[in-house]
C-alpha cells in the first residue's frame, strides 16, 4: 500500500518553494546510523517504499529501520494529449519535500559496515546526493 495521508484539508496543493535548509530532523535521533540528504528535491512515495524494501532485504530480518520522511504533498498531472487549461489535473502521486540536512532513514542493531552497505543501496534509489551519518550524543 503506498504511503500517503489518510485525510487532507485540501485535495490539491501549489508547487511551493525549495529555499533554505532543513528546519528539523538534522540529527540521527532514533537509531545508530542514517542517511542525510545533501541537496533539495522531492522524494516520491514509490522511492521511499523502494528504499525500505532494499534495506529490509539486505538486513534479512535483523536490525531496525526508521523512516524519517512522509509524502504529504500531492502532485497533480493532466492526462496525455489534453490541451492546456480547463483546470488543474487530478492527483497523480505524493511526494515528500526534502531540503539539505534532512535525515531520511535510520537503522540500529546492525554492524556499521552492514548499515553502510544497506543505506548505500537505499540511496541509489533516491536520485539525490546523500551521505552516511552516525549518531552524535547531544550535550
From Swiss-Prot:
Family recorded in the similarity comment: Belongs to the universal ribosomal protein uL16 family.
Cited InterPro entries: Ribosomal_uL16, Ribosomal_uL16_bact-type, Ribosomal_uL16_CS, Ribosomal_uL16_dom, Ribosomal_uL16_sf
Keywords: Ribonucleoprotein, Ribosomal protein, RNA-binding, rRNA-binding, tRNA-binding
GO biological process: translation
Gene3D superfamilies: Ribosomal protein L10e/L16
GO molecular function: rRNA binding; structural constituent of ribosome; tRNA binding
Name of the molecule in the record: Large ribosomal subunit protein uL16
Function: Binds 23S rRNA and is also seen to make contacts with the A and possibly P site tRNAs.
Amino acid at each position: 500500500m503506498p504511503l500517503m495521508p489518510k485525510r487532507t484539508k485540501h485535495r490539491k496543493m501549489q508547487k511551493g518553494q525549495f529555499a533554505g535548509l532543513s528546519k528539523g530532523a538534522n540529527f540521527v535521533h532514533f537509531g545508530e546510523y542514517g542517511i542525510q540528504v545533501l541537496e533539495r528535491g522531492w522524494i516520491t512515495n514509490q522511492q521511499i517504499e523502494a528504499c525500505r524494501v532494499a534495506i529490509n532485504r539486505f538486513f534479512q530480518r535483523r536490525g531496525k529501520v526508521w523512516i524519517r520522511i512522509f509524502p504529504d504533498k500531492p502532485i497533480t498531472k493532466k492526462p496525455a494529449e489534453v490541451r492546456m487549461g480547463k483546470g488543474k489535473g487530478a492527483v497523480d502521486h505524493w511526494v515528500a519535500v526534502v531540503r539539505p540536512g534532512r535525515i531520511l532513514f535510520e537503522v540500529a542493531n546492525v554492524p556499521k559496515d552492514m548499515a553502510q552497505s544497506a543505506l548505500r543501496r537505499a540511496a541509489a534509489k533516491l536520485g539525490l546526493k546523500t551521505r552516511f551519518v552516525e549518531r552524535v550524543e547531544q550535550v
